[in-house]
Swiss-Prot record:
Its main location: cytoplasm. The keyword DNA damage does not apply. Necessary for formate dehydrogenase activity. NCBIfam families: FdhE (TIGR01562), PRK03564.1 (NF002925). Pfam families: FdhE_C, FdhE_central, FdhE_N. GO terms for biological process: protein maturation. Belongs to the FdhE family. This is Protein FdhE homolog. One of its GO terms (molecular function) is ferric iron binding. InterPro entries: FdhE-like_sf (IPR024064), FdhE_C (IPR056796), FdhE_central (IPR056797), FdhE_N (IPR056774), Formate_DH_accessory (IPR006452). One of its GO terms (cellular component) is cytosol. It is found in: Cytoplasm. It comes from the Bacteria. It comes from Actinobacillus succinogenes (strain ATCC 55618 / DSM 22257 / CCUG 43843 / 130Z).
């Protein structure tokens, strides 16, 4: 799957003709504030409220760090195919600055176990931190302790989200192949989002790293592209803002959040808060195909 950044003279032409739905880029100016608010809302009377509130603290720290130390705009040469590909992008040391700031922000509120994790990361060498980041980015999650992974990923994501702001945002997908991973950075999604507003009813996958969204047609598996064995599962609630889409062909599942049911849903926050749905899917022998940045596979 490739994306193409349109020159100015093509933008109006494309707007008046049929094209694939555009890529959507998150704005860090409001992404983190909205997510933190949603996490705190979902934490009310939740069995895992403490962890949801911890996640909100991390997101608020991302927001603060972005405001105080934004990534300086640099002229980049972007490839057409996944311009910020995690496997090839020469990331700078800026993400480690973000990690240090994140740890410093969270430490005063951390419990004893978390302080041990923070101390370990603060003492780690640059080489060790880069090694751990490499492992996470190529999905070798078992090589990184899950408590460390949350902080490292939060710093990497803050870095990658800002990189997307330097890509001209009039970009389209050239084809519909290999849609399971992000066309911008090649990371896996956290969940699907069924949109409302101008994109009413369209399904987008939301990237777990750079927070971009790309369109994938509904009623087909986001992993194997099959459509015959799809089923949808939800927890019994009034709104059912979150459902799991399971595929009987490849035995994977990915959750979907519905903006039309609740305009304040957030793919990361609502996916995390619906962890009991994950437990049900695992009991039914389905494997999660996405990644929530606050729930890494255990060692």
């Amino acid at each position: 799957m490739a994306i193409r950044i349109l020159p100015e003279n093509e933008i109006k032409q494309v707007a008046s003709s049929f094209q694939n739905p555009p890529l959507l880029f998150s704005s860090p100016q409001n992404l983190y504030a909205r997510r933190a608010q949603r996490l705190r809302q979902l934490a009310e009377n939740h069995p895992f409220s403490d962890y949801l509130l911890f996640a909100a603290d991390v997101v608020e720290a991302q927001n603060l760090i972005f405001a105080e130390n934004p990534l300086e705009k640099t002229e980049f040469t972007f490839n057409q195919l996944r311009p910020l590909d995690i496997k090839h992008w020469p990331r700078s040391a800026k993400w480690r600055e973000y990690l240090s700031a994140l740890l410093a922000e969270i430490k005063p509120r951390a419990n004893e176990q978390m302080i041990g994790t923070i101390d370990c990361l603060e003492k780690a060498s640059s080489e060790e931190l880069e090694r751990l980041a490499d492992k996470l980015l190529v999905q070798e999650y078992a090589q990184v302790a899950s408590d460390k992974a949350v902080f490292i990923w939060a710093a990497l994501s803050l870095y990658w989200v800002q990189l997307t702001q330097f890509i001209p945002h009039h970009a389209i997908m050239e084809n519909a192949e290999d849609l399971h991973t992000c066309p911008v950075c090649n990371s896996v999604p956290v969940a699907s989002v069924v949109q409302f507003g101008s994109n009413q009813g369209l399904r987008y996958l939301h990237c777990s790293l750079c927070e971009s969204e790309w369109n994938v047609v509904r009623a087909k598996c986001t992993v194997c592209d099959q459509s015959k064995e799809l089923e949808y599962w939800g927890i019994d609630t009034d709104k059912e803002t979150v459902k799991a889409e399971t595929c009987g062909d490849c035995h994977s599942y990915l959750k979907t959040v519905y903006q039309e049911k609740d305009p304040y849903v957030d793919p990361v926050a609502d996916d995390l808060a619906s962890i009991f749905l994950d437990i049900e899917m695992e009991e039914k022998q389905f494997s999660r195909s996405g990644l929530n940045p606050f729930v890494f596979p255990a060692e």
